[in-house]
Amino acid sequence: MDFYSNLDSRSLDSETPTLFEIISAQELEKLLTPSIRYILVHYTQRYPRYLLKVANHFDELNLAIRGFIEFRQLSHWNSTFIDKFYGLKKVRNHQTISTERLQSQVPTLLEQRRRLSKTQIAVSLFEIVGVPYLRDKLDHLYDKLYPKLMMNNLDPKESLKTFVQYYFLKLYPILLSVLTTIQVLLQVLYLSGTFKSPSIIMWLFKMKYARLNSYDYTLDEQRVNKFLNKTSPGKLGTGNNRIRPITLTESLYLLYSDLTRPLKKGLLITGGTLFPASIFLLKFLEWWNSSDFATKMNKPRNPFSDSELPPPINLSKDLLADRKIKKLLKKSQSNDGTCPLCHKQITNPAVIETGYVFCYTCIFKHLTSSELDEETGGRCPITGRRLLGCRINKTTGEWTVDGIRRLMM
């Protein structure tokens, strides 16, 4: 699945992955459990009868299922599900062996010696599945007990239970800070090339990251062929010394192998395409939730924020011939600081879309006047242009006015 990675392996080191690849894989790893939980909760609300018990025991089920999947990946590829997507694997860290020289001379022997041991596989499985599970449980316990500590309801001298809870609340944040500091320090040393292990557990158990190569894919092809040919019909009746015909049991065995072989191929094809597609979906959801594009798409449209405004609609010739309109137009041409509506000095100035300034109370009363109909109302009293922020409720006949902006003088 490393072919689905967005990294060009030709421009990178053929042996040691970069820290940014490792961090990217770890960030994607953290998205798996919350994404599955979100999908499960969504469908639990629709079908609570069938999924409520599953949702209540999600942590344990996720631990078991993901543990099985990751164990298979670590046993076959020495890589986790996400690391394989990025073309990464874990190998033994032989500090006394020159891997570059052996890689060019005896690559197969080197790859065999670098395969993870059973202990290292178990430790890697615990790091991927067990550590996040314990972290979630401890965080939940800390959030549950912390209010008791703030209310002084935990007396360490009362009982052994309260003693453990009290010092857990005191030491747990310190322990997390120390582990985080060590983790960051190891990553900095890995970035500088001093250390080959970017995490505490990998450093303690002498493991490091490497890239998947032709040896891993050849080994996988051998496993696939063995899996498909496990019940191959060619194994029956091919001997030269065989005289008797095929028995009923052997006929059923051949029928079973003919039926299961397409199913096995379909299972392999589905696993090879469905899982990478789900990872691409997770990456898309991560981008969607973190980008401004999603915010703009979910934001309701504002009629005043459109870049292309509709052209203004002027009053008809009959309305423009009105003496009152002509008087307002003539009055607005004077720049004496008076309101065109009340003809007094402007108080509490407000501007409308056409740029003319009025008293706030005057322009608001004018635009909300019930005497104006849909044709004459909702317009600038000076230019006669229709205002976008004025809308009439045809049921009640009342005007809704937006777009009046007060001026700070």
Swiss-Prot record:
GO terms for biological process: protein import into peroxisome matrix, receptor recycling; protein monoubiquitination; protein ubiquitination. It is found in: Peroxisome membrane. The keyword Transmembrane helix applies. It holds the Pfam family Pex2_Pex12. It is a multi-pass membrane protein. It comes from the Eukaryota. One of its GO terms (molecular function) is zinc ion binding. Zn(2+) binds at residues 339, 342, 359, 362. Pathway: Protein modification; protein ubiquitination. A zinc finger (RING-type) spans 339-384. Residues 1-18, 76-117, 193-273 are peroxisomal matrix. GO terms for cellular component: peroxisomal importomer complex; peroxisomal membrane. Residues 47-50, 153-155, 302-409 are cytoplasmic. SUPFAM superfamilies: RING/U-box. Keywords: Membrane, Metal-binding, Peroxisome, Protein transport, Transmembrane, Transmembrane helix, Transport, Ubl conjugation pathway, Zinc, Zinc-finger. The chain crosses the membrane at residues 19-46, 51-75, 118-152, 156-192, 274-301. Component of the PEX2-PEX10-PEX12 retrotranslocation channel, composed of PEX2, PEX10 and PEX12. Component of a retrotranslocation channel required for peroxisome organization by mediating export of the PEX5 and/or PEX20 receptors from peroxisomes to the cytosol, thereby promoting PEX5 and PEX20 recycling. The retrotranslocation channel is composed of PEX2, PEX10 and PEX12; each subunit contributing transmembrane segments that coassemble into an open channel that specifically allows the passage of PEX5 and/or PEX20 through the peroxisomal membrane. PEX12 also regulates PEX5 and/or PEX20 recycling by activating the E3 ubiquitin-protein ligase activity of PEX10. PANTHER family: PEROXISOME ASSEMBLY PROTEIN 12, PEROXISOME ASSEMBLY PROTEIN 12 PEROXIN-12. The three subunits of the retrotranslocation channel (PEX2, PEX10 and PEX12) coassemble in the membrane into a channel with an open 10 Angstrom pore. The RING-type zinc-fingers that catalyze PEX5 or PEX20 receptor ubiquitination are positioned above the pore on the cytosolic side of the complex. The RING-type zinc-finger is degenerated and only coordinates one zinc ions, preventing E3 ubiquitin-protein ligase activity. Belongs to the pex2/pex10/pex12 family. This is Peroxisome assembly protein 12.
